UniProtKB/Swiss-Prot annotation:
Organism taxonomic ancestry: Bacteria, Bacillati, Actinomycetota, Actinomycetes, Mycobacteriales
Gene Ontology biological-process entries: translation
Family: Belongs to the universal ribosomal protein uS15 family.
Record's subunit section: Part of the 30S ribosomal subunit. Forms a bridge to the 50S subunit in the 70S ribosome, contacting the 23S rRNA.
Molecular function per GO: rRNA binding; structural constituent of ribosome
The organism of origin for this protein: Rhodococcus erythropolis (strain PR4 / NBRC 100887)
One cellular component term from this protein's GO annotations in UniProt: cytosolic small ribosomal subunit
Protein name: Small ribosomal subunit protein uS15
Keywords: Ribonucleoprotein, Ribosomal protein, RNA-binding, rRNA-binding
Functional description taken from the UniProt entry: One of the primary rRNA binding proteins, it binds directly to 16S rRNA where it helps nucleate assembly of the platform of the 30S subunit by binding and bridging several RNA helices of the 16S rRNA.
Length: 89
């Protein structure tokens, strides 16, 4: 379920502040969102994979905390990030 290096480069190139950015909240949230969508697709076919389900819940919680931090520090950045990722419909 891990992302390949190419997938990481695509996500970080699109959402990172610069090419090698991996630590900004936007990059971290984008990476978590990609992993969450991949894991959600996996769980649709493997309904009894409870170990992965727990990992999914941990990732969702981490993403929620990062989004809370971005919203607290810069609301405009938060709104653009939410809109770009397609969260909070």
């Amino acid at each position: 379920m891990a992302l390949t290096t190419e997938e990481k480069k695509v996500v970080l190139g699109e959402y990172g502040l610069h090419e090698t950015d991996t630590g900004s909240p936007e990059a971290q949230v984008a990476m978590l969102t990609k992993r969450i969508t991949d894991l959600t697709e996996h769980l649709k076919t493997h309904k009894h994979d409870h170990h992965s389900r727990r990992g999914l819940l941990l990732m969702v919680g981490r993403r929620r905390r990062l989004l809370k931090y971005v919203a607290k520090t810069d609301v405009a950045r938060y709104r653009t990030l939410i809109e770009r990722l397609g969260l909070r419909r």
